[in-house]
């Protein structure tokens, strides 16, 4: 079969590679450079964590939303001008985390695509010739004290429920692992099975290049819709003309929303904008990835320097970046690691990108309503990078008509059908 994959981020690249491995003729549509700055995969926080099963929306969050609207320094901000359009999504977002039962179901679904993510990335990176980019050195969550950790009891209970294990560190343990960490932090949780990527852009580029070497074709075009012959897919429409095909995969990140509508599924997908800053001299920073509890940010040593990633900004996809969000990350990092250099010249790069996010925190994976010849693979939010390889395998199974490696029922687009919350 001829399969057209729309998008060459980590999810699209993984889908294309699995499909070409299975013997399909594969065309990858990507208007920009695979692994380039336009992709959420490029600027992602680099973590590959089985601990990322905790949804953004949790019980009691609704009480905090008004505060987010007025706190310019907080980890989550909503642009006022976007609020009217965002309101339906925001309502569903709060309802998704309204009860413990709901977040337990979400965590279980996320665990199904995250549990073995470090091993999958190690195998994939080795296959595509850049195994040195994936390191499984553990991921550290740093807290001021044990009570601060215990205040997140539900989050850690969800992680324990999904099979995660960790090791607790006191101040001496923190100092041994991270000598540069401020003495404000006196308690830590080390997820030893966690991994990270030292250069996400190069990694994604290598996956696409490997797929092309195996026979896939990379076309610099953007998918704009579909042509059908009855219930069957006839072609993918692009800004360069139609491409006849038998199957199609929607993996275009935030741009997937319009394609999903064309495939019969009006999915509530919003741009959850994230930022990162890179400090070239991170020698006084973390030796391994660290997430300080008060900053809600990933501090990760990478090939380019110390990457400081985080922030959630809900705004229009076309709104200009607010670089103050990146500056907040730098300011916090300098408090977390007092030895980091000061001054604007210490920051070598700033980036903003769009996490494609659904209100319930789960991706959309599975056949489209208009035609089962189209398979959705988008909306992964914060877990797209970690779950990219397994999503690719699931999609290849669905295209082949085989039983998928994981149950895709929780990820079906139909969960957003009219009348469902």
Where are these regions (language model features)?
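Glycine-rich FAD pyrophosphate-binding loop
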Residues: 21-42
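Rossmann-like flavin
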Residues: 87-209
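Active-site substrate-recognition segment that forms the wall
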Residues: 44-47, 52-96, 225-233, 241-372
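C-terminal catalytic lobe of FAD-dependent flavoproteins
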Residues: 166, 294, 335-421
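A conserved short coil-to-beta-strand element within the FAD-binding core of flavoproteins
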Residues: 169-178, 219-234
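N-terminal Rossmann-like FAD-binding beta1-loop-alpha1 element of flavoenzymes
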Residues: 2-28
């Amino acid at each position: 079969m001829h399969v057209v994959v729309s998008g060459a981020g980590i999810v699209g690249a993984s889908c294309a590679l699995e499909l070409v491995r299975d013997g399909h003729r594969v065309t990858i549509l990507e208007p920009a450079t695979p692994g380039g700055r336009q992709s959420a995969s490029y600027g992602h926080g680099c973590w590959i964590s089985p601990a990322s099963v905790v949804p953004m929306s949790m019980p009691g969050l609704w009480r905090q939303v008004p505060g987010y609207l007025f706190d310019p320094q907080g980890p989550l901000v909503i642009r006022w001008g976007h609020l009217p359009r965002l309101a339906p999504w925001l309502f569903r977002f709060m309802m998704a985390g309204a009860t413990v039962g709901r977040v337990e179901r979400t965590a279980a679904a996320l665990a199904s695509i995250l549990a073995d993510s470090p091993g999958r990335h190690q195998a994939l990176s080795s296959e595509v010739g850049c195994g040195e980019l994936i390191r499984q050195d553990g991921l550290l969550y740093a807290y001021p004290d044990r009570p601060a950790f215990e205040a997140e009891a539900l989050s850690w209970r969800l992680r324990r429920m999904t099979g995660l294990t960790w090791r607790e560190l006191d101040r001496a343990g923190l100092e041994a692992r991270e000598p540069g960490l401020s003495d404000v932090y006196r308690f830590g949780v080390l997820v030893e099975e966690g991994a990270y990527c030292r250069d996400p852009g190069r990694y994604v580029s290598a996956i696409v290049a490997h797929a092309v070497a195996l026979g896939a074709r990379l076309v610099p075009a953007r998918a704009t819709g579909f042509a059908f012959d009855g219930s069957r897919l006839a072609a993918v429409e692009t800004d360069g003309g139609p491409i006849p095909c038998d199957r199609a995969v929607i993996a275009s990140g935030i741009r997937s929303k319009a394609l999903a509508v064309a495939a019969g599924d009006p999915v509530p997908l919003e741009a959850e904008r994230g930022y990162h800053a890179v400090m070239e001299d991170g020698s006084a920073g973390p030796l391994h990835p660290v997430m300080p509890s008060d900053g809600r940010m990933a501090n990760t040593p990478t090939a380019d320097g110390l990457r400081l990633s985080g922030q959630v900004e809900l705004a229009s996809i076309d709104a200009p970046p607010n670089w103050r969000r990146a500056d907040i990350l730098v300011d916090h990092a300098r408090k977390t690691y007092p030895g980091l250099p000061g001054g604007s010249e210490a920051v070598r790069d700033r980036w903003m990108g769009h996490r494609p996010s659904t209100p319930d925190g789960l991706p959309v994976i599975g056949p489209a309503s208009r035609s089962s010849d189209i398979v959705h693979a988008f909306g992964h939010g914060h877990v797209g990078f970690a779950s990219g390889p397994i999503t690719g395998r699931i999609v290849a199974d669905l295209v082949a008509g085989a039983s998928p490696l994981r149950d895709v029922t929780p990820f079906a687009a139909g969960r957003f059908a009219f009348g469902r919350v």
